[in-house]
């Protein structure tokens, strides 16, 4: 129930579109259900593809939903990311903002500690839960998603406290909550140190050393960021189209390294297009990622609860209290006691609907069809493998029906000429990324990087050939150097393999 409550923070309590947030969270749960079921010997939604048996990697989902989608959107808008403003003189104001919103710092930190204690949740979900909580508690929401400092303070407070919370199960019970804690646990085992109650008795000094090292590292990291932030912020003055090739190459290379399979890039591009559509239609994307991250711990805890108590676990006092809290939170938003006054119903933290009424209705209908098809497919799974997808798809179907009604009744018409032009431009940039993938499949990552970078700069940016060649050489050289230093594998093309 704690995981479900976390989903509500990121889904129903994000912005003024609770149904869209809930649907996005259910989509994330459904994406996370792809692959081998942890509680039964069944492969779900794999379509006979070996790649999908282990599920879709988190890296591909995050880079697609946010990275690729934002790249396409920024390229379509054109220009630079930020205006030229004075930098390096806002540190004192930042301190004042933190002091002014000290309550957000405390609540965000507590959410982060809780996310760290629960295995499998981690910093990503904890940060978005904190963001959803801040948005839900704010009396005015118009500025969220547009630079409101409260939307930075809450998630960063949670992000900084997640690892601290992760120390509790890791050091006391040998149960890591995430990848960093697992690495720490492995290092302790390597030196013959057994985390657990005995460690508290025999190696208490080491525990305090770890805690102080973490605190000092955070302080030094913050100081370094303050020192470098003016120089790094000036990158936002550069026209984004000039930065895009290097960013795209980095994202493609990073996505491939998660499992070293081309399926990672396929998934990233597909989810990137989905993320762009969600942004244009004012669907919050954060709940989808949080739902995906929470799928594994939620299903594991559900399986354990059913295995131990049957369906009677729903009648336990703690579950009832959390369920009532969840229901009250949802009703609070849906009935408009807090949320409906300040943010239009069709608007979320992603902004207003851009593509118009008809695409919005069609997109919601597509979500309905996906949920219905997933529910029908789940009927063929064994009980323990089917209960979680059903728990995700049944609410999604009802919410999709309600959202279709809202979309049909909402005011709005066809998008304007400028919107249609930007949409066509965005699709053109997306197909450029697809072309990059095809080049990788044919010639391998190195040659494809050179061809894509030079072609993008020469075609889209209209950069002269000599600076474009120099830029291309730097990108390829840095990629080669990084691969050599870290021992990373380059995807090979069909032509080079023959």
Language model regions located:
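Hydrophobic, membrane-inserted alpha-helices
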Residues: 3-9, 108-112, 162-167, 227-228, ...
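Hydrophobic, small-residue-rich transmembrane alpha-helices and their short perimembrane loops
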Residues: 103-198, 205-213
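Flexible extramembrane loops and terminal tails that flank transmembrane helices
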Residues: 318, 333, 338-441, 462-498
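Membrane-embedded alpha-helical modules
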Residues: 1-79, 190-325, 334-335
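Helix-loop-helix hairpins and the membrane-proximal interhelical loops
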Residues: 45-148, 233, 250-256
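Long, contiguous bundles of hydrophobic transmembrane helices that form the permeation core
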Residues: 26, 42-47, 73-100, 336-363, ...
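Transmembrane alpha-helix interface/packing and boundary motifs in multi-pass membrane proteins
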Residues: 10-15, 110-121, 167-173, 251-260, ...
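Alpha-helical transmembrane segments of multipass membrane proteins
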Residues: 32, 69, 119, 123, ...
């Amino acid at each position: 129930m704690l995981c479900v409550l976390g989903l509500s923070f990121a889904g129903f309590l994000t912005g003024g579109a609770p149904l869209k947030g809930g649907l996005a969270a259910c989509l994330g749960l459904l994406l996370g259900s792809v692959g081998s079921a942890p509680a039964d010997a069944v492969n779900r939604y794999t379509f006979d593809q070996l790649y999908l048996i282990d599920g879709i990697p988190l890296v591909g989902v995050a880079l697609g939903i946010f990275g690729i989608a934002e790249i396409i959107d920024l390229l379509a808008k054109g220009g630079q990311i930020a205006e030229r403003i004075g930098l390096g003189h806002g540190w004192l104001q930042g301190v004042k903002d933190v002091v002014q919103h000290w309550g957000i710092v405390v609540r965000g930190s507590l959410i982060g500690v809780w996310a760290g204690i629960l295995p499998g949740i981690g910093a990503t979900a904890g940060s978005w839960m904190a963001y959803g909580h801040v948005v839900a508690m704010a009396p005015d929401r118009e500025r969220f998603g547009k630079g409101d400092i409260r939307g930075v303070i809450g998630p960063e407070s949670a992000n900084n406290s997640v690892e601290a919370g992760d120390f509790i199960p890791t050091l006391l019970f040998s149960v890591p909550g995430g990848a960093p804690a697992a690495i720490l646990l492995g290092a302790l085992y390597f030196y013959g140190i057994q985390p657990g109650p005995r460690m508290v008795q025999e190696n208490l000094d080491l525990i305090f050393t770890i805690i102080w090292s973490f605190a000092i590292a955070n302080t030094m990291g913050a100081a370094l960021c303050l020192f470098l932030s003016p120089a790094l912020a000036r990158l936002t003055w550069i026209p984004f189209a000039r930065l895009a090739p290097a960013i795209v190459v980095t994202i493609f290379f990073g996505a491939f390294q998660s499992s070293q399979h081309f399926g990672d890039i396929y998934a990233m591009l597909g989810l990137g297009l989905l993320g762009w559509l969600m942004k244009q239609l004012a669907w919050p994307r954060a709940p989808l990622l949080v739902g995906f991250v929470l799928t594994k711990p939620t299903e594991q805890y559900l399986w354990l609860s059913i295995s131990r108590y049957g369906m009677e676990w729903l009648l336990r006092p703690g579950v009832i209290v959390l369920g009532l809290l969840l229901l009250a939170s949802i009703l609070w938003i849906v009935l408009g006691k807090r949320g409906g006054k300040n943010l239009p119903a069709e608007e979320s933290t992603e902004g207003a609907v851009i593509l118009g009424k008809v695409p919005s209705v069609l997109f919601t209908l597509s979500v309905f069809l996906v949920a219905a098809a997933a529910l029908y497919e789940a009927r063929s799974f064994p009980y323990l493998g089917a209960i979680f997808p059903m728990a995700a798809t049944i609410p999604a179907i009802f919410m999709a029906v309600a959202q279709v009604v809202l979309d049909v009744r909402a005011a709005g018409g066809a998008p304007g000429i400028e919107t249609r032009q930007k949409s066509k431009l965005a699709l053109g940039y997306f197909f450029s990324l697809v072309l990059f993938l095809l080049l990788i499949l044919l010639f391998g990552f190195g040659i494809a990087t050179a061809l894509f970078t030079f072609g993008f700069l020469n075609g889209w940016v209209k950069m002269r050939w000599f600076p474009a060649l120099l830029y291309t050489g730097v990108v390829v050289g840095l990629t080669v150097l990084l691969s050599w230093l870290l021992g990373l594998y380059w995807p090979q093309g069909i032509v080079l393999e023959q």
